[in-house]
Amino acid sequence: MNHWLVKSEPESYSFAQFQKDKTTAWTGVRSFPARIFLRQMAKGDEVFVYHSVSEKAVVGVATVIKTAYPDPTVEPDEKGEWVCVDLKAGKALPKPVLLAAIKSNRAFKDIQLVRQSRLSVAPLTEKESAELRKLGGL
């Protein structure tokens, strides 16, 4: 099993809404590196959801339930073969893991969230995902 981090603006699509929906297609990703990562996701992979912009915290966990397929939100004039995956919402973290805590923790010294902060989908190491679970109270 691999581990991933995806970003969402809570004003657009919060983890609480995701939990109400139970599942969602993770659409709208328009970054070439992120597209590569979406294509690498496998059914059953663990996905941490990060609220960007206002909250700046890892807030919940999800699972990949359908691997990459063509993103239905692509406009006809858009360049690129954009994809999405389907995710199933899991638990909200009892203690959201703030970006400041991630930046100050040596376990995250190489985490993509900090090194490539504009990337909306990124892999996590086993060590990083274990530390997120620990800090988040899971």
Task: Give the location of each predicted region.
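Charged phosphate-binding loop/patch that engages nucleotide di/tri-phosphates or the phosphate backbone
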Residues: 120-138
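A generic structural signal for short beta-strands and their flanking turns/coil linkers
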Residues: 2, 22, 43-45, 58-60, ...
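Short, charged beta-turn/beta-strand-edge "cap" motif at the junction between a beta-strand
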Residues: 50-56
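Compositionally biased, charged N-terminal/linker segments
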Residues: 1-43, 137-138
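Short, charged, solvent-exposed linker or helix-capping segments at domain edges/interfaces
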Residues: 17, 96-102, 133-135
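Hydrophobic beta-strand signal
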Residues: 48-49, 63
